[in-house]
Amino acid sequence: MQYIPLKEKYENEIKPAMMKEFGYKNIHQVPRLEKIVINMGIGEGSRNKDVIDIHAKELALIAGQKPVVTKAKKSISNFKIRKGMPIGLKVTLRGVNMYNFLYKLINLVLPKVRDFRGLNPNGFDGRGNYSFGLTEQLVFPEISPDQVRRVQGMDIVIVTTAKTDDEARKLLELFGFPFKR
């Protein structure tokens, strides 16, 4: 199998296949990937600044882009959180970085996930966006297991311009996403 950048694959193979299957009249009606958002919620980050810094470095290695620290919008006494405390990290990938991350996710990361049987096809939100979670950052090739102090999961949201879930599912399947049957 020869390596073809995903952007080229989208232009040359996926667009024509989508036009044929869904009967689009115009090439611009074909759904495309808009962005990928990686979110990492860090519970104890509000009490320990080092935890935020460590996970920010890991997320920067994974995404190839510096993450933004997300802060609490409201105070919640049961969770011991005050308004403005850091509670997580997020990265929004677009363009070349998005396609590079997607390639790495499909070909390197998902095959390394323990007991992986395919992605849940129910992760669509009704508007053509797909969300799923990973339980540990160790499945990424940039993270070495020796240097990880605390295993941390993350949420990944793939935002498309698709109008329906069926269009988005077909788009992601053509990109090579392994959905459960």
UniProtKB/Swiss-Prot annotation:
PANTHER family: 60S RIBOSOMAL PROTEIN L11-RELATED. It comes from Thermosipho africanus (strain TCF52B). Belongs to the universal ribosomal protein uL5 family. One of its GO terms (biological process) is translation. Keywords: Ribonucleoprotein, Ribosomal protein, RNA-binding, rRNA-binding, tRNA-binding. This is one of the proteins that bind and probably mediate the attachment of the 5S RNA into the large ribosomal subunit, where it forms part of the central protuberance. In the 70S ribosome it contacts protein S13 of the 30S subunit (bridge B1b), connecting the 2 subunits; this bridge is implicated in subunit movement. Contacts the P site tRNA; the 5S rRNA and some of its associated proteins might help stabilize positioning of ribosome-bound tRNAs. The keyword Zinc-finger does not apply. The gene is rplE. It comes from the Bacteria. PROSITE patterns: RIBOSOMAL_L5 (PS00358). The keyword Zinc-finger does not apply. NCBIfam families: PRK00010.1. GO terms for cellular component: ribonucleoprotein complex; ribosome. SUPFAM superfamilies: RL5-like. Signal peptide: none annotated. This is Large ribosomal subunit protein uL5. One of its GO terms (molecular function) is tRNA binding. Part of the 50S ribosomal subunit; part of the 5S rRNA/L5/L18/L25 subcomplex. Contacts the 5S rRNA and the P site tRNA. Forms a bridge to the 30S subunit in the 70S ribosome.
